[in-house]
């Protein structure tokens, strides 16, 4: 099997991140979204923080972890993770969730896994949700793989 056929939809590898970060940083639409989401921090500081991330986990810890815990504190009664059925924290596992909130649910699971010293999740996300090129890049930095919803039979 030629795995390169999945290059356009798989999560980025860590060695690809510097180039992707530079592409995101140079994108005016991403700049606008980032400064809108984090208005009290100059964009150049956000860019510097991105450039310091060497792995996808570094990125998740630097940008996603704190934001997700703030959302949880402000909008939930709390988060818990019973991982007693997981015998080996160093192995990969498959988690199955409903389609209630594909991004937030997996984000909450990831921060709980980080707190247990475990690896974060990869998620499938439909390309119908990726309305701008910078969003497609950002979700792949955040360990998502893209489900292409409008493929022809020949492309499948």
Predicted regions, residues:
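Membrane-anchoring hydrophobic helices of lipid-metabolizing enzymes
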Residues: 1-93, 99-110, 136, 140-144
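Long, hydrophobic, well-ordered secondary-structure blocks that form the structural core
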Residues: 96-156
């Amino acid at each position: 099997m030629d795995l390169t056929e999945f290059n356009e939809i798989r999560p980025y590898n860590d060695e690809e991140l510097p180039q992707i970060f530079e592409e995101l940083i140079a994108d005016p639409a991403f700049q606008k979204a980032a400064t809108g989401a984090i208005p009290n921090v100059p964009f150049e500081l956000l860019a510097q923080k991105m450039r310091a991330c060497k792995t996808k986990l570094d990125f998740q810890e630097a940008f996603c972890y704190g934001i997700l815990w703030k959302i949880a504190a402000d909008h939930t009664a709390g988060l818990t993770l019973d991982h007693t059925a997981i015998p080996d924290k160093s192995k990969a596992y498959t988690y199955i969730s409903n389609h209630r909130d594909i991004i937030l649910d997996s984000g909450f699971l990831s921060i709980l896994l980080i707190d247990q010293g475990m690896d974060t999740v990869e998620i499938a996300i439909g390309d119908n949700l990726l309305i701008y090129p910078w969003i497609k890049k950002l979700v792949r930095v955040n360990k998502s793989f893209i489900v292409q919803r409008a493929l022809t039979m020949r492309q499948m």
